[in-house]
């Protein structure tokens, strides 16, 4: 599997955010295994254990911008039971949260606030873009709306829809868990320029393209 290595770029222009650079690399654990089977296997077990704890205890930041936030809140009700994924502990402060969901229309006036809240999240942190407005500006192709939060934030999972269903949020949460389970982060207590290795996950539209082509009878909304 290919990975994307992300490091801080001190030479990046001030206008660009975040200040980082990325490149495609191979699995770092596979490279370490060639140096020593014992240490390579031990590092793999440690990475899997840490990732297991992180992905099964994702605390979301209680933050919403527009109508998609209503659908996100619906996922926390008893019919959907988001507690199954360890994400029922909603935090009122970004310093206590693991990830934030941009649910709604990112206006230009709101962009600095969103960016500041993202910076207050402690590492490791992740971002889910929920809804057409957060993904690409939606139908608001106007001067006051940012055409996608990925213009100023690194996004891990995109949720399409206007607005998305609560089930779509749960699926995005599971996709984020799968991605976290394959991440390679430094385990040292020394902060340095080790970088973060994120797996290159395939897009769901590409993965399900063959299944959609085979469809001859459309399902009703109750069957989806």
Curated annotation (Swiss-Prot):
The keyword Disulfide bond does not apply. Binds 1 [4Fe-4S] cluster. InterPro entries: NADH_UbQ_OxRdtase-like_20kDa, NADH_UQ_OxRdtase_20Kd_su. One of its GO terms (biological process) is electron transport coupled proton transport. It is an enzyme of class 7 (translocase). One of its GO terms (cellular component) is plasma membrane. It catalyses: a quinone + NADH + 5 H(+)(in) = a quinol + NAD(+) + 4 H(+)(out). Coiled coil: none annotated. Residues 201-224 have a biased composition (Basic and acidic residues). One of its GO terms (molecular function) is 4 iron, 4 sulfur cluster binding. Keywords: 4Fe-4S, Cell inner membrane, Cell membrane, Iron, Iron-sulfur, Membrane, Metal-binding, NAD, Quinone, Translocase, Transport, Ubiquinone. Its EC number is 7.1.1.-. The keyword Cell membrane applies. [4Fe-4S] cluster binds at residues 67-68, 133, 162. It is a peripheral membrane protein. NCBIfam families: nuoB_fam, PRK06411.1. This is NADH-quinone oxidoreductase subunit B. It comes from Aeromonas salmonicida (strain A449).
